[in-house]
């Protein structure tokens, strides 16, 4: 019996360590997801340095407490899974959002981003925001637009002078 308790303590410590390092994490109900969908989500999340765990509520509550994060005890119930973002803070939110929108029975429970607890509504709002790379490309296209228009104007003037 003590060996099982020791394994649980090690598991809690492992999850707590990951939560301390995490830039974000998302807790969601997975009970209506098929095994195939859960595996697909796991694969998508693991493409970068992020991880997904299906945990017992008690283990997750203890790990969150041990990581020094407060305010999650009331939200964690039913069958839940957690996606932890170690490098990209927004990838876990966006990855889970795809499954939340595809299957209305899969629900956000809560999340954590930049030392703040997020509600399900806040997670939904964040998930539809463009990523950092998308924002950079939008910004660069805005910067290039005046130069591009000027170039086309010069080309039109050159074409009219050639005729």
Swiss-Prot record:
Any GO BP annotation: translation
UniProt cross-references to InterPro entries, sorted A to Z: Ribosomal_uL10, Ribosomal_uL10-like_sf, Ribosomal_uL10_bac, Ribosomal_uL10_bac_type
Protein family: Belongs to the universal ribosomal protein uL10 family.
Cellular component, GO, one term: ribosome
A Pfam match: Ribosomal_L10
The protein's assembly and partners: Part of the ribosomal stalk of the 50S ribosomal subunit. The N-terminus interacts with L11 and the large rRNA to form the base of the stalk. The C-terminus forms an elongated spine to which L12 dimers bind in a sequential fashion forming a multimeric L10(L12)X complex.
GO molecular function terms attached to this record: large ribosomal subunit rRNA binding
Function: Forms part of the ribosomal stalk, playing a central role in the interaction of the ribosome with GTP-bound translation factors.
Keyword terms of this UniProt record: Ribonucleoprotein, Ribosomal protein, RNA-binding, rRNA-binding
Keyword Cell cycle: no
Name by which UniProt lists this protein: Large ribosomal subunit protein uL10
Gene3D superfamilies in the record: 3.30.70.1730, 6.10.250.290
CDD domains: Ribosomal_L10 (cd05797)
